[in-house]
Amino acid sequence: MDKFIIMTMLLVSTNAYDRICIGYQSNNSTDTVNTLIEQNVPVTQTMELVETEKHPAYCNTDLGAPLELRDCKIEAVIYGNPKCDIHLKDQGWSYIVERPSAPEGMCYPGSVENLEELRFVFSSAASYKRIRLFDYSRWNVTSSGTSKACNASTGGQSFYRSINWLTKKKPDTYDFNEGTYVNNEEGDIIFLWGIHHPPDAKEQTALYKNANTLSSVTTNTINRSFQPNIGPRPLVRGQQGRMDYYWGILKRGETLKIRTNGNLIAPEFGYLLKGESHGRIIQNEDIPIGSCHTKCQTYAGAINSSKPFQNASRHYMGECPKYVKKESLRLAVGLRNTPSIEPKGLFGAIAGFIEGGWSGMIDGWYGFHHSNSEGTGMAADQKSTQEAIDKITNKVNNIVDKMNREFEVVNHEFSEVEKRINMINDKIDDQIEELWAYNAELLVLLENQKTLDEHDSNVKNLFDEVRRRLSANAIDTGNGCFDILHKCDNECMETIKNGTYNHKEYEEEAKLERSKINGVKLEENTTYKILSIYSTVAASLCLAILIAGGLILGMQNGSCRCMFCI
């Protein structure tokens, strides 16, 4: 009875203490993240790092508006296909949009030497200005030749606007003619020319009189001579003849000289290139030009996002997230989401971080829960929460910085002869993309692991800080809480939370309460010892009586005899 009274007093006394617990936020989020050692870890909040949304339009960028070539290929614009006259005026662009199904290319059948490089050089500029290089009205030739293969938009035969088809002058004269142009402009000029290869000798003499001709094009760095390759070819656009097209760059101060007695498609206009653009020619059939502005333009559309990664397109320009071949990379920006254990026991005592998170904490990640004679309360610790949030912000910036190595997959364009190079290039690009995606995923896994470890450490640090503040004035209950050995009203609780608690102020009261606890424990231990001794003695006596009784009974019925030998 005495023991029961003592234990009851201890239980009532223990649960009557004012209590403060340290805990962390939990919520009903279903977000999960992966770490280096765990998969699908529940967390209170995550940030998606991969942008998957895009606006299906080609927008203006910080460098200006795109140039849509409409029905024309870029080589048709450069050489001046008569059906592309809309582009004759001086124009500028941030990038160029070319439709793959555009019908207008080189109107007279033939091929452009180093076309891919020409496309690159031309598109890298921000604008052009057409410059007249030569006036052939003073030459002893007939200028402005036309062809049925190059009809104008208005109908009727025509020819390229940037080069001039020179033929013999009646009656049958085509002597050597030559001309000179000096580049006195403020920049480099792209100049163009061609060589005509008739299908037979009859057409050769009909156009140029001379059966054997020689044309030369020279600059400070170019020295080329050409003779026609006469012979029949398959009919293309109504022509058995062919033209080879050429181009060059005339730098500022350099001189261009041309000389011919036939078959030269002579340079007439050049392009003075100015500025720098994104240097891209986007080939897409369906995406329209939009009335929009973007910092990031991909081949698949515009992206306006602050995320560090995107999977919309590996071809992009401007200030874009890095391309990764991943659908999702989630970064933990909250806590490990551990639902709290329901209160148990006689008095439903509040519990700390050992028992799980608190769903009621909405204004911070870490904080306190207290109970005293004035009631209960919960408050976030703003300092530790803000420090954790700052670290998360730094983590996002850290990921961006670590992935900031320049990596862009350029849309390489190769001729039919170089298709093997194109195939090898695509394989290399694919391998680089796989490696880049692996690096990004590994970096996120590392940061997630570090984040969750830091959160655990932050809660433990806050707990240890409160322990130091309370000193010997409280008892660690082992579940993230402290039972305070003195009366602690709300004002007192606030000092514990904000770090201004003075343990010496309550030291005497706490010592007295601790001595009472120790006294009760001592009395309890003494009672246990006395009861233990009594129990041992009683058990021994009972055993002795049983043995003696057994012997006496056995001797009475003769089953047991005692023999004494002398």
Task: Map each language-model feature to its residues.
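Cleavable N-terminal signal peptides of Sec/SRP-targeted secreted and luminal proteins
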Residues: 2-16
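Extracellular, disulfide-bonded carbohydrate-recognition/adhesion ectodomains
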Residues: 17-240, 247
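Membrane-engaging insertion elements
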Residues: 358-403
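Single-pass alpha-helical transmembrane segments
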Residues: 352-359, 534-554
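Membrane-penetrating hydrophobic segments
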Residues: 321-355
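Cytosol-facing boundaries of transmembrane alpha helices in integral membrane proteins
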Residues: 521-541, 560-566
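Transmembrane-helix exit/juxtamembrane "anchor" motif
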Residues: 370, 374, 546-565
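Long, extramembranous regulatory segments enriched in acidic
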Residues: 18-63, 69-74, 95, 230-334, ...
